[in-house]
Amino acid sequence: MSQLFYQGDSDDELQEELTRQTTQASQSSKIKNEDEPDDSNHLNEVENEDSKVLDDDAVLYPLIPNEPDDIETSKPNINDIRPVDIQLTLPLPFQQKVVENSLITEDALIIMGKGLGLLDIVANLLHVLATPTSINGQLKRALVLVLNAKPIDNVRIKEALEELSWFSNTGKDDDDTAVESDDELFERPFNVVTADSLSIEKRRKLYISGGILSITSRILIVDLLSGIVHPNRVTGMLVLNADSLRHNSNESFILEIYRSKNTWGFIKAFSEAPETFVMEFSPLRTKMKELRLKNVLLWPRFRVEVSSCLNATNKTSHNKVIEVKVSLTNSMSQIQFGLMECLKKCIAELSRKNPELALDWWNMENVLDINFIRSIDSVMVPNWHRISYESKQLVKDIRFLRHLLKMLVTSDAVDFFGEIQLSLDANKPSVSRKYSESPWLLVDEAQLVISYAKKRIFYKNEYTLEENPKWEQLIHILHDISHERMTNHLQGPTLVACSDNLTCLELAKVLNASNKKRGVRQVLLNKLKWYRKQREETKKLVKEVQSQDTFPENATLNVSSTFSKEQVTTKRRRTRGASQVAAVEKLRNAGTNVDMEVVFEDHKLSEEIKKGSGDDLDDGQEENAANDSKIFEIQEQENEILIDDGDAEFDNGELEYVGDLPQHITTHFNKDLWAEHCNEYEYVDRQDEILISTFKSLNDNCSLQEMMPSYIIMFEPDISFIRQIEVYKAIVKDLQPKVYFMYYGESIEEQSHLTAIKREKDAFTKLIRENANLSHHFETNEDLSHYKNLAERKLKLSKLRKSNTRNAGGQQGFHNLTQDVVIVDTREFNASLPGLLYRYGIRVIPCMLTVGDYVITPDICLERKSISDLIGSLQNNRLANQCKKMLKYYAYPTLLIEFDEGQSFSLEPFSERRNYKNKDISTVHPISSKLSQDEIQLKLAKLVLRFPTLKIIWSSSPLQTVNIILELKLGREQPDPSNAVILGTNKVRSDFNSTAKGLKDGDNESKFKRLLNVPGVSKIDYFNLRKKIKSFNKLQKLSWNEINELINDEDLTDRIYYFLRTEKEEQEQESTDENLESPGKTTDDNALHDHHNDVPEAPV
């Protein structure tokens, strides 16, 4: 069997090393459990010592409140451990082995190959781990928390747990003991906790009742720091999608808090993306350190337990896999060659222009690697403000060319040409762009790509409309299946699996029209008609813009010799190679003067549609299009749509689309529409069904088991779905489906699939060798202590404090020092800054703040803005309102502008973003659709002029922000959470501290000083007014005559009176805007919207 579908076994050396590592990990866990002394006394001693230190530190607010004594007994006694019979739903031996090894291995990171049933294994493992534990002879339900789970993961885990619960209830005998028959304790409820679903009290009750909770990291951090749940109440934590966690993620913050207070609970992490653990320097050890993991379990496809289970089924299977190798058309082959050459030259030019940044890995051998673009971005983005504009364009061109390569094999000719034409239009001279063509358009092979893309649509005054070669092969396969069903009488449906929803919709239309008179050509004609209509609307908008503005005259780009040829100056009428020179000149003008569609726009498309089909067929097509739109509307009401095609020859089979439609498709479902389509529905036998679905919607083994297809057609290669088919065939040995595996031969599709298989195998090989040499990590309770960083801080503080050394050597002043406290808005826990503050020994107190994001002292308040948030806040003028609130309540309002660690420390990259159908594939110089760099700086300057006392801090990374906050807190008092919470709300206490009064007096003084900005007002006039009028508000209420009596100058009175009236109107408008806003603080783009009842109050 070809290596495209099945992967052979690995080397014997790797198999032996995997077995040795698994055995060693399990044995080390057993030895630790057997030899572990009773360290409860030691823990008490350490806690007593910590409490003494805390008493000496005079802690203002406990980070995690001390729980009653019964919490300390939450650790299960090893003497109470007893065997329990638990039924699992894992049919394959290697899956059961994964659960067994995960249970006996302490704090393990389990990395599996794609498509081996990870979610089923996780659900069964959760079912086992949530078994009630025996504490002091009494059963107690376990509390297991699931972190970093996607919404679809929660749905599938919940379904699997319900099935496991049903099996457990049906398997109980009547003779069981009274303890085991307690259904309430042995139930394992699964709940999903989000900010919008549960309030504080409901979450507190859930924590106490136990069970399995899938919770967002932001909510869990707040609950841990606020004392809603104590770490000792948590039996263990399970982290999904560990490969997606960033450095200093919230999950690592949670696990650090959990392990610092709970040393006996378990931590498990799962991933099925081994490639992410070999991309950087020692990423496996880094990830294990962040997640507090101690062991690694590797389960690749070539592991002997897995391969023996899956390959044995393949050898005995009667239904072999049929590989359908489809050849590319001549036009597609030429386009693929041209795109690869363009990529080659763009990569070479990027390396030539940036030799100090270029990597040897940037070559054509790795260009199809999924991490190729990520590798370029990781190097170029941090230096984005230093590289030239041509280099920026090359980076975007490489991304766009890869996108075109993918579109070549996944989309039809019309969509591909539309993408090419869109790129040409985007590189025409524009009002908002001062540069010329994108570099890839200046390559000689670009003309080859453009010409053949046009040729697939229009050639020699007629529409060619080249069909996708896979469509014809798919129709032939379905015909063969139809004939086979006449003899074997298989009852299962036919499943067609593809990559995305758009392909599903396109295949449904193609199969519907395959047996009609015009067939697939009619589908392409309708799509081309729609494309022409969109082009006409776009041109109208362009003309409106062009009529208002003019083009820049000097719009040129410095093109290197790689992308240009010098024009030869000669007097000869004929020049050798003139055709090539003309082609290059034509390409130069492709994006400026020549419209690639002008050649066939005069050709009447409506006549071509009617040609050979007649008016009746055209009306039928329009009726089908209307029916399709209605069907799409019904889709969101049901998970399946039924496409009626009475002319189909697939045994009168019906096409059924399973999966989610694109989000832009809206529904207008009503009773009349439903009643209209009720008569069109009829019963369809399973063997006549053709199900079209995406790989994403089939991303679990349960989907295939529910459908039970007799035939599976893989329209595109996908390594994960291939493994799912193998697992499904191993489960249903008697009813194995017949599989058709379609791919383009000698294409980037085939090469990408082979590269993905090789990349996964190489990643597992590196992980096996790295795990063999991985150093063991040991830690004590002192290492887990949160207060390990405070010693250096106290020494630094003691040097700054000017204490009297004659009074007990200055110890009294040192004794009064307390631990640093920072009050953080609960919505800021999506960022990594609160976790870094915690790691640096600062007490982080979550509160619902109306004013500011971080309160570091009673006088200093920070409003943190990432660059994207800053641009959005400047646009909607929200930042000005936030600064005004901080200025009202704090003496030192501060705007903190924070960049990410991997970003360029400049506003230039962010001012170059704009929407271009897909922001990741833009090939134009992007003048920001939000704000340009000059506009950002201008708005910031206006903000500073409006609020002179506003401080601005620029931080290149969250780590630098921590250092800045530590420096600002040196020698200053700690903030009060109760005061910080009520600022900006209606619950202002009458006995508010003197700080508010001082701020009010300072505000009055600053308002009076604005009078000096009025032309003609001298200092003498200013002091005369201050001597007679003490309050600025009282001055605003004076009439013109009263002000004139004070000044005795009518001209000056007019100016002052106008100034006061203007100030009063602005204040009234601002107060109106504040009343319209909600009492709680809203968030920016990356903040999570919360309700007030979902956030805890300040801990006391």
From Swiss-Prot:
Keywords in alphabetical order: DNA damage, DNA repair, DNA-binding, Endonuclease, Hydrolase, Nuclease, Nucleus, Phosphoprotein
Composition skew (Acidic residues), residue ranges: 1065-1076
Subcellular location: Nucleus
BP term (GO), one: removal of nonhomologous ends
Segments of this protein annotated with the region Disordered: 1-47, 1063-1100
GO CC terms in record: endonuclease complex; nucleotide-excision repair factor 1 complex; nucleus
Domain ERCC4 residues, every copy: 821-901
Taxonomy, superkingdom: Eukaryota
Feature: compositional bias, Polar residues: 20-30
GO molecular function: damaged DNA binding; DNA endonuclease activity; single-stranded DNA binding
Annotated positions of the Phosphoserine modification: S613, S1071
Residues the record lists as Phosphothreonine modifications: T1072
Gene3D superfamilies given in the database record: 3.40.50.10130, 5' to 3' exonuclease, C-terminal subdomain (1.10.150.20)
Main localization, broad class: nucleus
Family the UniProt entry places it in: Belongs to the XPF family.
Name of this chain's protein: DNA repair protein RAD1
Species assigned in the record: Saccharomyces cerevisiae (strain ATCC 204508 / S288c)
Gene designation per UniProt: RAD1
